[in-house]
């Protein structure tokens, strides 16, 4: 019996079904040498293996449910990400070989333009002119005190000096009128507060006078003493070393000293042999250590043959004194009559330099 002939549509369906089966077989069976992508994705690398439990073998767990291919392709394994972070944590900034002393320099860009100015603050308080004048007076008083400290110390005796006289009106400006205050201020500003180079400061000086009359016998060498410091304008004393009782001045420092002595001498009773002879004379000396013959001394000689009953004899000069050496005034009466040195005769010294 002849087979029944199938229609053409059925034959086309069979051909299509065979092609689909062949294509499915080719895609599902990979090549023998090629590794499976799903297996490579499923198995972690050797270094990242987790410890296996007692129920797992070396080949893997006994049964693992299959995961969808599309979900596996788009997911990230947290364990793999953590292991990658651990391996990369000792590189870059956290590297062990990086020097701790060298800090990473931050690179900034170019500075931008300045911003707009801020708002203006509130106006300050209104200060009256009287307050400004009072504050200015306080500033001037401070400048005056600073100038007084810069000035040399005043002498023990004598006036306060021209500087103190010029500054005295300024200290009394509190009770004066405004016109007087302005005048004093202008006078103070006219005098420079910081003058130029000054003369060197005198560290040692004195001027003393004989307190009472001193009798000098004939043919005698007498050392004068018992002085006092005059309380008069122009008198001075600076530094230690003067013994008013003994009349000796001890040098406080070694240096060159300008010494001077002026004596007012009165003749006593006339000599028994008649008027003074030409060889009768007086010697006024300023000696070191009371050794007029051995040490250097200042000397003045005066004859008595033509002198009056009251006369003056002076001596001055410069001597170099070591520290601690003293000087004093001597009168050598080389005449046949006694003499009287009147009170008020003076002795002075000034340290010139070292």
From Swiss-Prot:
Residues 26-37, 51-62 have a biased composition (Low complexity). GO terms for biological process: establishment of localization in cell; fatty acid transport; intracellular iron ion homeostasis; negative regulation of apoptotic process; negative regulation of autophagy; negative regulation of BMP signaling pathway; negative regulation of gluconeogenesis; negative regulation of osteoblast differentiation. N-glycosylated; required for secretion of the mature protein. Residues 69-80 have a biased composition (Basic and acidic residues). Residues 199-354 form the C1q domain. Residues 1-28 form the signal peptide. Residues 26-123 are annotated as: Disordered. This is Erythroferrone. The lineage of its organism: Eukaryota, Metazoa, Chordata, Craniata, Vertebrata.
């Amino acid at each position: 019996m002849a087979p029944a002939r199938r229609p053409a549509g059925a034959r086309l369906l069979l051909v299509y079904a065979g092609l689909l089966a062949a294509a499915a077989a080719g895609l599902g069976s990979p090549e023998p040498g090629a590794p499976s992508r799903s297996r490579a994705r499923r198995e972690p690398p050797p270094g990242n293996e987790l410890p296996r439990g007692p129920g797992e073998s070396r080949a893997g767990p006994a049964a693992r449910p299959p995961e969808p291919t599309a979900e596996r392709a788009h997911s990230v394994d947290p364990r793999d990400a953590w292991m990658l972070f651990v391996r990369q944590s000792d590189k870059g900034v956290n590297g062990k070989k990086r020097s701790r002393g060298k800090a990473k320099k931050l690179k900034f860009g170019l500075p931008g333009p300045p911003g707009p100015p801020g708002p203006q603050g509130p106006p300050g308080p209104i200060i009256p002119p009287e307050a400004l004048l009072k504050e200015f007076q306080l500033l001037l008083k401070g400048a005056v005190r600073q100038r007084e400290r810069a000035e040399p110390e005043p002498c023990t005796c004598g006036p306060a000096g021209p500087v103190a006289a010029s500054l005295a009106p300024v200290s009394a400006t509190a009770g004066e009128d405004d016109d007087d205050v302005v005048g004093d201020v202008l006078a103070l500003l006219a005098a420079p507060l910081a003058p130029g180079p000054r003369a060197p400061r005198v560290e040692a000086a004195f001027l003393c006078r004989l307190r009472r009359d001193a009798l000098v016998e004939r043919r005698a060498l007498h050392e004068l003493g018992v002085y006092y410091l005059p309380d008069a304008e122009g008198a001075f004393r600076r530094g230690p070393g003067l013994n008013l009782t003994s009349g000796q001045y001890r040098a406080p420092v070694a240096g060159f000293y300008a010494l001077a002595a002026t004596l007012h001498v009165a003749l006593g009773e006339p000599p028994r042999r008649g008027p003074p002879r030409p060889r009768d004379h007086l010697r006024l000396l300023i000696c070191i250590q009371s050794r007029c013959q051995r040490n250097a001394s200042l000397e003045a000689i005066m004859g008595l043959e033509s002198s009056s009953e009251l006369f003056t004899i002076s001596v001055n000069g410069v001597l170099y004194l070591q520290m601690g050496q003293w000087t004093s005034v001597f009168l050598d009466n080389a005449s046949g009559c006694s003499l009287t040195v009147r009170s008020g005769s003076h002795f002075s010294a000034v340290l010139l330099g070292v």
